[in-house]
Amino acid sequence: MTDTQRLDRLPDCASVQTRGRLVQTEHGWRLRNLHITCDLAFSGGDRPAARDHLALVEVGGAREGAVLQVSTWRVITRAGSGPTRLSAGRTTELGRAIEARAAFNRRARNFFEARDFIEVETPAWVRAPGTDVHLAPVGATVHLDGAHHPRPGYLHTSPEFSMKRLLCEGAERIYQLARVWRDGEVTARHNPEFSLLEWYRAWEPLDAIIDDVEQLVCQTLHAESARPVTAPIRRVTMQEVVWEACGFDILENLNADALRETVRRLELLPPHLCETPHWDDLFFALVVEHLDPHIATMGAVFVTDWPAPLAVLARKNPDDPRTAERFELYVDGVELANGFGELTDAQEQRERFEEDARAREARGLPALPMPEAFLEALRFGMPPSSGVALGVDRLLMLQLGTDTIRDVAPFALWRDEAGELVDWP
């Protein structure tokens, strides 16, 4: 048997020679590695002792059902300590998560190659990460000209600006599997570093991107996955979601005073949450209290046509400029993808960034550099385009049936039983 074969794929009585970690359980001994977890049955007097717990071993024998009947075994090296931090705090096998991610990366690359996309790479260290009030970038200063000449910068929150610059240079269908960083809380669904699959179609409408997302997600969340999703995926507008969850028309309440009055009249939020002067803060409070719980009951759903103030990088809907060409895909309340019909007007984009900057100042948030290189590219000219970012970690969580990102991202931060943050790698 080669080391990459699976025990459960072998016929009974097949000869087995493999390696792994020896684990003592209340029921006996077990062998574990990234590919195999199986019970061991030792015959004769040559059996492991307590000191062999967690040792790396080589074993040989024959399979009988789910048990490996051991005829020979030897210790390669004994463990000098207990389970590592990498092993702690998870509920699924590490190997299962690693293999699922590798399989998804292969699936994604095959998916896009079949559709004439080109895989690209863009810098993770950037001068201007974007101005979004609700995203906190991770600072990263480098010293390109020596210790006395620091160059402040950031780890990108998304490869969006760089990929759009490639669209301005003539790229038409591009995708990227990117590691990105966003400062903020550590939760079951959030980690400061995570994986995004982002792609763009020049000269094509947003519906083409929505179709891509539907096909790729349904291929990944197939019938054998923990949470299958089948096409067609339902589509509803954000206006409809707010009507169903809150009982009012969000598009008639696009300024802070009007929305605050409506929220108070309908008693949708506690009084202290209504004190904010910012429309988007009121809206996101409604998201937490009402919209997210409602969306969680809808299964797999595309929420489209978001209010224009919530889409700084998206173009407005020509049929109703109160809304933007933006969608999000949710599965059982888990936000998976966020897509735009991309704004290409450089002056309008600058004005939106400047509005963001004023909003950051009003909230006491740090000022961020204006993305001048991106704006310069827009002035050069960007074709009408559509794009999306899909959260790979969350998609894998749904595929494997886990509620925590740590089960699919081995190095994700996590909190112990006392609520203390475990040190990062």
Regions found by a protein language model. Give the residues of each.
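Metal-assisted phosphate- and nucleotidyl-transfer catalytic regions
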Residues: 216-333, 355-382, 423-425
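Hydrophobic, well-ordered secondary-structure elements that form the walls
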Residues: 303, 339, 391
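Short, well-ordered loop/turn and helix-capping segments at boundaries between secondary-structure elements
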Residues: 183, 205, 222, 247, ...
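Hydrophobic face of alpha-helices
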Residues: 105, 109, 113, 210-217, ...
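Generic beta-strand/beta-sheet core signal
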Residues: 32, 120-123, 303-306, 330-332, ...
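Active-site pocket scaffolds in enzymes
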Residues: 346-425
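Short, glycine-/Ser/Thr-/acidic-enriched flexible segments
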Residues: 23, 160-162, 180-182, 201-204, ...
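Class II aminoacyl-tRNA synthetase-like tRNA-binding/catalytic domains
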Residues: 2-208, 218, 292, 397, ...
